[in-house]
Design a protein with these regions (language model features):
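ATP-dependent adenylation/nucleotidyltransferase module used to activate substrates
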Residues: 1-149
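Conserved small/polar residues in nucleotide/adenosyl-binding loops
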Residues: 156-161
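A short, aromatic/hydrophobic, helix- or strand-capping loop or linear motif
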Residues: 151-154
Length: 166
């Protein structure tokens, strides 16, 4: 059976790594590239804020080339759509027929992707789709994959009103 030429949409996060691992374990898909979006000014991924240099190191370690789609810092959905359409066209010329994602349950995101990609001849694949977060985490840990926290998000700039130290 000929494997389906596929691009994996890479965020650099644990769910993305787990979905990629599952897709690579399958004889169904030939992963020809990891695709990520990055802020043109900061050179960080738009999804998790991971430095592009780290994403490149991840791709090198995985053994699949990274394709970075540059996005304007203040660009909206129209800019994103245009940039992704160009990227899809590039991969369609190489015979890619499937885009693989690591989503679990975001129906609106999946619907958007399917609506955008189907007219371009790309089928959406979601190896983790419909599984509970607990099940995905358990499978991730059992897979032998490991994760390292490389970015965090500051949610509060002042002590919480519940902070016992204040």
């Amino acid at each position: 059976m000929e494997r389906k030429k596929s691009v994996f949409n890479w965020s650099g996060g644990k769910d993305s790594a787990h979905a990629l691992w599952r897709a690579m374990q399958s004889d169904e898909y030939e992963i020809v590239a990891l695709l990520t979006t990055a802020n043109r000014s900061t050179r960080r991924s738009t999804m998790h804020g991971i430095p592009e240099s780290l994403l490149l190191a991840q791709a090198e370690r995985i053994g699949v080339p990274l394709h970075v789609v540059d996005l304007a810092p203040q660009g909206g959905m129209e800019d994103y759509g245009e940039a992704m359409t160009r990227a899809v066209g590039h991969f369609r010329q190489q015979g890619v027929t499937h885009f693989i994602f690591g989503d679990i349950f975001l129906h609106d995101v999946r619907s958007y992707r399917e609506a955008q990609l189907a007219p371009l001849g790309i089928e959406v694949v979601e190896p983790l789709w419909g599984r509970s977060s607990a099940e995905v985490m358990r499978d991730f840990l059992e897979s032998g994959l490991r994760t390292v926290v490389v970015t965090t998000c500051l949610l509060y700039t002042s002590p919480s009103p519940r902070d016992p130290k204040t």
